[in-house]
Structure formats: structure tokens, C-alpha cells
Design a protein with these regions (language model features):
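Conserved P-loop NTPase motor module
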Residues: 1-5, 10-21, 25, 118-161
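Conserved P-loop NTPase motor cores
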Residues: 4-116, 141
């Protein structure tokens, strides 16, 4: 909706203001954007997101886009450029069409693709600079840290009681 788009732009403006204030105080600003693909649907928020990606680092900002399914991002030339220029990516299990597009965009080998093909939780690929490496994270579930980090609805309900 139009109101939602205005709200998104206002949030982005506030974030940029915070980055500017923090830069003047010699502080870094971490900006986590969940459901990132929603910002790509509207032309103005998509363009602003590109500016954030391009300029934040120079200002001490560290943007992080989070999305469950990369398909929406891969449909957008803007987002494809952002992905290709990102220093650090975490890729978990991917749909077949997404794997093909990611392989082309990021130069992922067939062997590496096996780490994001029909894999379980905690397995995937890390892209850091020009390196792409597989990872397996079998984080112990019986820890307080796991409870704090879990995003699985059933586990959250269990933790909250």
C-alpha cells in the first residue's frame, strides 16, 4: 500500500540519520533488514537500498539483508547487483531454480552446489570475498544460546511455556 511504502522510506531515512550520527561519534551501525525482498518491490525503496549497500561501509554502516527465499531477489536486477557485490553471504538450502541463478551470479561450482541442495538445518555455503566454502553447524540444542537464537515457532512456544 502507499502508506506502507511511505513508512518503509521513513525507516530508511531514520537509519541513514543514525549512521550519520554514529559516524560522527566514530561508531559502526549494524542494520539488519528481515524480509529484505519487500524493499525491492517498490522502486524508491529499492533504489534507496542500493545506495545503502554502496555507501554504508564508507560511513561505518554494516547492512544485512535477510530473506527466506532468494527467488524474489534474483528477479530484480538491482538485487542481483547487490548480491554480486556483497562481501559476505550465507546460503542455506535453495530451490532448484534459485541454485542455478546463484551459481551463475556467484560462480558456484557443481560440487559446491551440493551443499545447498536438499540439505538439512545448519548446512550451507559461505561466500566471503572471493572464497566460497561449505559449512556444517550442528549447534547443540540443549543450550541457552540455542534457545535464544531459534526461530522455529514450535521451539519458541516451548521455550516461552
Amino acid at each position: 500500500s502507499a502508506a506502507s511504502d511511505v513508512y518503509k522510506r521513513q525507516v530508511q531515512d531514520q537509519v541513514w540519520n543514525r549512521v550519520t550520527i554514529n559516524r560522527n561519534s566514530k561508531k559502526n551501525t549494524r542494520y539488519y533488514i528481515d524480509e529484505f525482498h519487500l524493499l525491492l518491490k517498490e522502486e524508491q525503496t529499492a533504489a534507496y537500498s542500493v545506495e545503502i549497500w554502496k555507501r554504508f561501509r564508507k560511513w561505518g554502516g554494516i547492512p544485512t539483508g535477510i530473506t527466506q527465499n532468494v527467488e524474489d531477489c534474483l528477479k530484480s536486477l538491482t538485487a542481483r547487483t547487490m548480491l554480486a557485490n556483497s562481501e559476505y553471504l550465507v546460503m542455506l538450502n535453495q530451490a532448484p531454480t534459485d541454485r542455478i541463478e546463484l551459481a551463475k551470479l556467484l560462480h558456484i561450482s557443481d560440487n559446491q552446489l551440493s551443499y545447498i541442495t536438499n540439505v538439512g538445518f545448519g548446512k550451507g555455503l559461505l561466500k566471503c570475498g572471493n572464497s566460497i566454502v561449505p559449512f556444517v553447524d550442528n549447534f547443540p540444542k540443549n543450550t541457552r544460546l540455542y534457545q535464544l537464537m531459534s526461530t522455529k515457532p514450535g521451539e519458541i512456544q516451548e521455550i516461552l511455556g
